[in-house]
Amino acid sequence: MALHDENVVWHSHPVTVAAREQLHGHRGVVLWFTGLSGSGKSTVAGALEEALHHRGVSTYLLDGDNVRHGLCRDLGFSDADRQENIRRVGEVASLMADAGLIVLTAFISPHRAERQLVKERVGHDRFIEIYVNTPLAICEQRDPKGLYKKARAGELRNFTGIDAIYEAPDSPQVHLNGEQLVTNLVSQLLDLLRRRDIIRS
C-alpha cells in the first residue's frame, strides 16, 4: 500500500447492497467461470447472461479478452501480471455485485490461490466458482483463436495447459462437463440460481 494510505478512508453510503438488490429483484453475486482456453467458458457465460437478460435480470459479463482492451491493457502474461489481472477483475466484480448485479466472469484464472483471493474479496456467500471441465484434447481441437497451434509450435510461451500449469478447482460449487450442449449447461445453471434463491424467474 502507498505511504499516504492512512489518509484514504472508506465512505459508507445511505443506499445499501440490500436496497439495491431489492430494486433489481434478485441478489447480487459473482459467477466465476474457470477452465482452459477453449473449454467453453465465454460461450456458456454469454449464453447464461442472455438467458438471464431475457428474464429481466440485471447482469454484466466480464470477459478475459475484453478487459485487456481497457482495464488491464497494461498487463502482459507473466505470473505477476496474470495475478494482477485477476485481482483487478475481482475488485470490479465485487463492486458490481455490491450494485446488485449478477456478474459473470470468464477467465482461465489458472491458480487456485488467485481464485481464493477473489472469493474472499467478494464474500463466500456471493461467489460461485464454476469449473468448465473440458479435456485438453477437446480444447485443442476447438482452438477457436489458434492459440494451441501457436503454443505447440513454440510461437507462444507460458500458455496454460501446454507449458504453464492449470490448477483445477478442488471443490467448485459447480462442475460442468464442457462437452455437453451449451443449452444443457445453461439449464443447469439457471436451476442452481433458482435453488439458491438468487433469481426467482
Swiss-Prot record:
Domain of life: Bacteria
Pfam families: APS_kinase (PF01583)
Gene Ontology terms, MF aspect: adenylylsulfate kinase activity; ATP binding
Alphabetical keyword list: ATP-binding, Kinase, Nucleotide-binding, Phosphoprotein, Transferase
Residues reported to bind ATP: 35-42
Enzyme Commission number(s) of this protein: 2.7.1.25
Top-tier EC class: transferase
A single GO BP: sulfate assimilation
Cited SUPFAM superfamilies: P-loop containing nucleoside triphosphate hydrolases
Catalytic activity: adenosine 5'-phosphosulfate + ATP = 3'-phosphoadenylyl sulfate + ADP + H(+)
CDD domains associated with the record: APSK
Active site positions, chain numbering: 109
Pathway: Sulfur metabolism; hydrogen sulfide biosynthesis; sulfite from sulfate: step 2/3
Known function: Catalyzes the synthesis of activated sulfate.
Protein family according to the UniProt entry: Belongs to the APS kinase family.
Official protein name in the record: Adenylyl-sulfate kinase
Organism: Salmonella paratyphi C (strain RKS4594)
Organism classification: Bacteria, Pseudomonadati, Pseudomonadota, Gammaproteobacteria, Enterobacterales
